[in-house]
Amino acid sequence: MEPAREPPSRARPPPPLAARPAPAPAAPRPRSPAEAEARGPEGLLRRSGSGYEGSTSWKAALEDTTTRLLLGAIAVLLFAILVVMSILASKGCIKCEAPCPEDWLLYGRKCYFFSEEPRDWNTGRQYCHTHEAVLAVIQSQKELEFMFKFTRREPWIGLRRVGDEFHWVNGDPFDPDTFTIAGPGECVFVEPTRLVSTECLMTRPWVCSKMAYT
């Protein structure tokens, strides 16, 4: 007979280890001033985009908008001033570059206009008046010679009889030693070498004169 076998032995569990003590909590790390500020109430407001920082941003945006509007208004005002100055300057330049209006001739310090169509003396005077001028006032023989370089049609001038005397339309006195006047009429026109008076209703061309621009 075979000898009886012993039952296999079971492994014994290891003896229980001694209970390990729980680790002590680590001491809190001191915070830097920046971390403390970020974790404080103002830091939370900054991170949330409202409150203190939001109010500051809104004020900055408002100030920026106001500044832009002010600068825009200043720019518009400066532009308007430049436009006005350019207009005034252009008018001044016209006077400086052209001492007489278009279709007028310069002689000495006067501008002269020689009409082409015949009219009576009063119509010629009115035309000159509307152009800020008068029927020509002649002060010398040279001025008379200049006029006849541009007209041969014996035009009206600004001389008229008032009572027994002749007077220039601008108020200057007439000097009989400078010119002689022929004819019994009231209004005066010019011939190449003398002045002639005739009826004012007769039609003739006329000559206007005025001071040149300075």
Swiss-Prot record:
Cysteines joined through disulfide linkages: C128-C208, C187-C200
Name of the protein described by the UniProt record: C-type lectin domain family 2 member L
UniProt entry tagged with the keyword Signal: no
Biased composition (Pro residues): 10-31
Annotated C-type lectin domain residues: 107-209
MF terms (GO), sorted A to Z: carbohydrate binding
GO cellular component terms, semicolon-separated: membrane
Transmembrane intervals: 69-89
Organism in which the protein naturally occurs: Homo sapiens (Human)
Bilayer topology term: Single-pass membrane protein
Residues annotated with Phosphoserine modification: S32
Keywords tagged on the record: Disulfide bond, Lectin, Membrane, Phosphoprotein, Transmembrane, Transmembrane helix
Superkingdom classification of source: Eukaryota
Location of region: Disordered: 1-56
Localisation per UniProt entry: Membrane
